[in-house]
Curated annotation (Swiss-Prot):
GO-annotated molecular function: calcium ion binding; extracellular matrix binding; integrin binding
PANTHER family: DENTIN MATRIX ACIDIC PHOSPHOPROTEIN 1
Protein name: Dentin matrix acidic phosphoprotein 1
Source organism per UniProt: Homo sapiens (Human)
Tissue/organ expression: Expressed in tooth particularly in odontoblast, ameloblast and cementoblast.
Low complexity composition-biased segments: 46-60, 337-354, 427-442
UniProt keyword annotation of Metal-binding present: no
Motif Cell attachment site per record, residues: 364-366
Positions with biased composition (Polar residues): 143-162, 245-257, 296-307
Glycosylation sites: N25, N285, N324, N345, N351, N413, N426, N467
Region named Disordered: 23-513
Compositionally biased spans, kind Basic and acidic residues: 163-180, 309-325, 484-502
Gene behind this protein: DMP1
GO cellular component terms given for this protein: endoplasmic reticulum lumen; extracellular matrix; extracellular region; nucleus
Length: 513
């Protein structure tokens, strides 16, 4: 979480810095643009030829020396937000050159209608010439090269015919400025598309490894997943920055950034699930080891203790439950004394051994209720470490049993009013009477020779209580639903029969008025 928060913070800073620089550069470029447009507008043919010449020169530079393109890509961290404005500056200078040519034409012919007619489509053609390179970058590179190689020949011939050094200087500026801008833009767009795909594939590979290994993933796998997440975050940040900086024409890069965002979310979820699985496995291993150690200690204590003959399983479970109640009452009344502490230790050891044997029996398939046994495992593992915390946990469990008994008594009172389940009444009433009668037999046992029977009876009793309460609650809900349906039917019938005489149809207006 900390790493993700830091990455989001850095992403916000990286988005804020280009925006401020964009505003400053835009103000400067807008002033230059207005200054050149105030002189004279440009003819469309010459601006399109200059844009095509800049495209061809950028393509030749990218094909001849790829080292320059890689260096320009490495410098994109600080310069990727400036290439668009270099293009804008280059077009503004080309407008100045075009204005000079048009002034010469007007001086020769003495006609002012030439500039007025061509002032409209000039900026549009310039924008189309600059944006056509970005739009058709990956679809038709060869056709653009073949069609553009003819344009610089005519441009060179036109430059040979001109004799003014001022126009040649302006032409060199136009060629040099968009050349750097287009080369950086081309390398940036292609590298982002290809690099984003490679990062996405590597990150998908990490996620598939996590899915295949599942529970068996160790710490190196989690480290690898974190590295994949960091890679995905960096790739997503790069693609988002490129999409925001070139939002005039780079629609494909923005699509790539959207494609990269979704796998990053999926891999975050997969890494979280794998980490939770690892934690749950470690907890299970710890609880199993504690259960084994406690079972060996309790077996020794049972060998040294007194062996008592077999009793009825119901009597054993009732005496166990009421033993803890009486111990809690004695501790609350008499305070922490030596005898109560010894009795609490003995009872905690007995209860821990019982819950451990419940875990073993459930692992064999005797008791198919894993949630309660898992809670008891956690409580008993804590009790084996600290006896005081164990007595507190058992006091909580006994308070829960008291609440369950009170709820069962309330459900008995309600079931007497609605005699729908007599069997549930009899079983719950017998259990309540037995629980009250067994309060006199507290502190009668210290070691049980057969604890499996008593534990199974406890689990069966708890299941019967839950089943009885569920059946009673379901019967109550059914009765309430039936009453609601009957009332709604009565209301509809009354509304149908009590309509006014004049209202013959179903609409709200009465026909008698």
């Amino acid at each position: 979480m900390k790493i993700s928060i830091l990455l989001m913070f850095l992403w916000g800073l990286s988005c804020a810095l280009p925006v401020t620089r964009y505003q400053n550069n835009e103000s400067e470029d807008s002033e230059e643009w207005k200054g050149h447009l105030a002189q004279a507008p440009t003819p469309p043919l010459e601006s399109s030829e200059s844009s095509e010449g800049s495209k061809v020169s950028s393509e030749e530079q990218a094909n001849e020396d790829p080292s320059d393109s890689t260096q320009s890509e490495e410098g994109l961290g600080s310069d990727d937000h400036q290439y668009i404005y270099r293009l804008a500056g280059g077009f503004s200078r080309s407008t100045g050159k075009g204005g000079d040519d048009k002034d010469d034409d007007e001086d020769d012919s003495g006609d002012d209608t030439f500039g007025d007619d061509d002032s409209g489509p000039g900026p549009k053609d310039r924008q189309e010439g600059g944006n056509s390179r970005l739009g058709s970058d990956e679809d038709s590179d060869d056709t653009i090269q073949a069609s553009e190689e003819s344009a610089p020949q005519g441009q060179d011939s036109a430059q040979d015919t001109t004799s003014e050094s001022r126009e040649l200087d302006n032409e060199d500026r136009v060629d040099s400025k968009p050349e750097g801008g287009d080369s950086t833009q081309e390398s940036e767009s292609e590298e982002h598309w290809v690099g984003g795909g490679s990062d996405g594939e590597s990150s998908h590979g990490d996620g598939s490894e996590l899915d295949d290994e599942g529970m068996q993933s160790d710490d190196p796998e989690s480290i690898r997943s974190e590295r994949g997440n960091s890679r995905m975050n960096s790739a997503g940040m790069k693609s988002k920055e490129s999409g925001e900086n070139s939002e005039q024409a780079n629609t494909q890069d923005s699509g790539g950034s959207q494609l990269l965002e979704h796998p990053s979310r999926k891999i975050f979820r997969k890494s979280r699930i794998s980490e939770e699985d690892d934690r749950s496995e470690l907890d299970d291993n710890n609880t199993m080891e504690e259960v084994k150690s406690d079972s060996t200690e309790n077996s020794n204590s049972r060998d040294t203790g007194l062996s008592q003959p077999r009793r009825d399983s119901k009597g054993d479970s009732q005496e166990d439950s009421k033993e803890n109640l009486s111990q809690e009452e004695s501790q609350n009344v008499d305070g922490p004394s030596s005898e109560s502490s010894q009795e609490a230790n003995l009872s905690s050891q007995e209860n821990s051994s019982e819950s451990q044997e419940e875990v073993v029996s459930e692992s064999r398939g005797d008791n198919p209720d894993p949630t309660t046994s898992y809670v008891e495992d956690q409580e008993d593992s804590d009790s084996s470490e600290e006896d005081s915390s164990h007595t507190l946990s058992h006091s909580k469990s006994e308070s829960r049993e008291e609440q369950a008994d009170s709820e069962s008594s309330e459900s008995l009172n309600f079931s007497e009013e609605s005699p729908e389940s007599p069997e549930d009444e009899n079983s719950s009433s017998q259990e309540g009477l037995q629980s009250h009668s067994s309060s006199a037999e507290s502190q009668s046992e210290e070691s049980h020779s057969e604890e499996d029977d008593s534990d199974s009876q406890d689990s069966s009793r708890s299941k019967e209580d839950s089943n009885s309460t569920e059946s009673k609650s379901s019967s109550e809900e059914d009765g309430q639903l039936k009453n609601i349906e009957i009332e709604s039917r009565k209301l509809t019938v009354d509304a149908y029969h009590n309509k006014p005489i004049g209202d013959q149809d179903d609409n709200d207006c009465q026909d008698g008025y």
